[in-house]
Regions:
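Hydrophobic, small-residue-rich alpha-helical packing segments that form membrane-like cores
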Residues: 1-18, 28, 35-36
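Hydrophobic helix-and-loop "lid/oligomerization" segment in the mid-to-C-terminal part
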Residues: 27-218
Length: 218
């Protein structure tokens, strides 16, 4: 919907939201009703939370009804992730900080297919096993994030780069899955455009983060 040639009236949908609209269009073509699509809304709400898109317009509606599914009848994979949360009713903020990081951790540390297996599993026992593995990935992600951020800050200090207008750091063994998080941490610390590099095969991989009014993409 952000394409200039797209006439759809709401342009803040995340990728999953666009996918849901496709499913909705297919359902209408097959004379199905919105009731047939409710089972997907826990995933849509999770994606809205994970992508930090604005909770306005259609996102607000999708998030509201998605949260109702999460709090009443979530799919086994989501249920397995939240069953130890000591809250009776989860909000979109809870999904941002509890559900989304765990799903993202699979792709950051191992492979995104593990998260796909979790959210498409119908057997609760198997889903709980997948959730346990993903919980370990999330713990590993936190530890890597902490360690690499520490190393990056030390590198800046050792190179006397505390007062530069930008941050560029590199270490060949930094885990590619967390350098984006590390870049965000460095922006929080120095508030300046930041690029974190690591080695990926025979090439370099990097994540960039910036500050308000400074576009590192264009």
């Amino acid at each position: 919907p952000k394409r200039e040639d797209c006439s759809y009236p709401y342009d803040e949908l995340c990728g999953c939201g666009v996918g849901f609209k496709l499913i909705q269009a297919l359902a209408e073509n097959r004379n199905q009703t919105i009731d047939d699509l409710v089972l997907y809304l826990d995933l849509v709400a999770t994606a809205i939370a994970a992508d930090i898109v604005p909770i306005t317009g259609e996102n607000r509606v999708l998030a509201k009804f998605g949260l109702e599914v999460i709090n009443s009848n979530p799919r086994p994979g989501i249920k397995a992730l939240i069953q130890n949360v000591k809250k009776k009713v989860l909000t979109i903020t809870d999904v941002v900080f509890i559900v989304a990081p765990r799903i993202n951790a699979a792709g950051r540390i191992k492979h995104g297919n593990e998260a796909v297996a979790l959210v498409t599993e119908y057997d609760l026992d198997q889903a709980e096993q997948f959730a346990s593995e993903i919980e370990q990935h999330n713990s590993d992600r936190k530890e890597l994030d902490k360690q690499i951020t520490k190393e990056a800050l030390l590198q800046i200090e050792e190179n006397n780069e505390q007062n530069r207008f930008s941050t560029v750091v590199y270490q060949e063994n930094w885990h590619k899955g967390v350098i984006g998080i590390v870049a965000s941490r460095l922006v929080e610390n120095y508030y300046r455009p930041t690029i974190v590099f690591t080695k990926s095969g025979e090439k370099l991989a990097a994540s960039a983060r910036s500050v308000k009014d400074f576009d590192v993409y264009n």
